[in-house]
Regions:
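A general structural motif
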Residues: 1, 25, 59, 84-86, ...
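NAD(P)+-binding Rossmann beta1-loop-alpha1 motif at the extreme N-terminus of oxidoreductases
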Residues: 1-53
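Structural motif
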Residues: 7, 31, 65, 89-92, ...
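Short amphipathic alpha-helical segments
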Residues: 17-18, 42-43, 74-77, 100-103
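Conserved short alpha-helix immediately C-terminal to the canonical SAM/SAH-binding motif I
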Residues: 37, 70, 95-98
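Structured loop/turn residues at beta-strand edges in well-structured enzyme cores
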Residues: 45, 57, 108-111
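Rossmann-like NAD(P)-binding element
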Residues: 54-82, 86-89
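Rossmann-like NAD(P)(H) cofactor-binding subdomain of soluble oxidoreductases
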Residues: 77-120
Length: 120
């Protein structure tokens, strides 16, 4: 494993980015709709680069740190872009609706979905 992508750099995603950067040799790519948060992530060296259409297919693990519907929307919109055999992990606090929507999507593509939880 070499590259980690993080979608959403708020409290959960930002904390994960900083911890991964501090304790691993992995390259961390991140994306955040709030421009100030994105700028801070770069300034704090929580990410190495922006998660884009070019960098997403390079990621071995992608952590999705959004609200439940945002997780579903992002993963379904980018389902064909994830690297084959990569792990796509949601970090939302609700499981049933997310897992019901995304396990079938992951089965159509060559990546693996994990319904995670930031507190468990």
């Amino acid at each position: 494993m070499q590259n980690v992508g993080i979608v959403g750099l708020g409290l959960i995603g930002g904390s994960l980015a900083k911890t991964i950067k501090l304790h691993t040799p992995y390259t961390v790519y991140g994306t955040e709709k709030n421009a100030d948060t994105m700028r801070r992530a770069f300034l704090m060296e929580a990410i190495d680069g922006e998660l884009t259409a070019e960098t997403l297919p390079q990621c071995d693990v992608v952590l999705i740190c959004l609200y439940p519907q945002g997780i579903i929307d992002y993963v379904t919109a980018h389902a064909a872009d994830f690297k084959p055999d990569s792990l796509v992990i949601d970090c939302g606090g609700v499981k049933q609706v997310i897992c019901d929507a995304l396990f079938p999507v992951s089965q159509r593509y060559a990546w693996h979905f994990i319904g995670g939880h930031p507190m468990a």
